[in-house]
Amino acid sequence: MTTQPIISTLDSERLEPLVSGSWTDAPVLRLRALLGRASKVAPPQVPSDVVTMNSRVRVRYPGENESEALELTFPDAGGLSVLSPLGAALFGAREGESVECTGARVSRRVTVERIEYQPERERHFDR
């Protein structure tokens, strides 16, 4: 049984313009579907274990000893773009959850080990 994804109204408002229109690549379609089915809550009500925009997360790929630190960002912000296959897979995921990241030629699972920084948890709503 899967639970309904939870995202902030602020993230929803900022992402909607990015995924509306005629884009048909997989990450955009994935985000569009997530925005359509997610429960949208005010930023202070977002659970602290949900990957939101501008979160810093530590992820691990199966079979690898080292984890990787990533910051989920809007395009052109210098981090992992939410419009990339991995960024779209991580947005809305929960700590401890494994998600499928599907790129042009490869598909692999990645696990969110922990959320090191989440703006909502820190009450940073002006991001």
Where are these regions (language model features)?
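Non-DNA-binding regulatory cores of transcription-related proteins
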Residues: 54-110, 116
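Peptidyl-prolyl cis-trans isomerase
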Residues: 45-56, 120
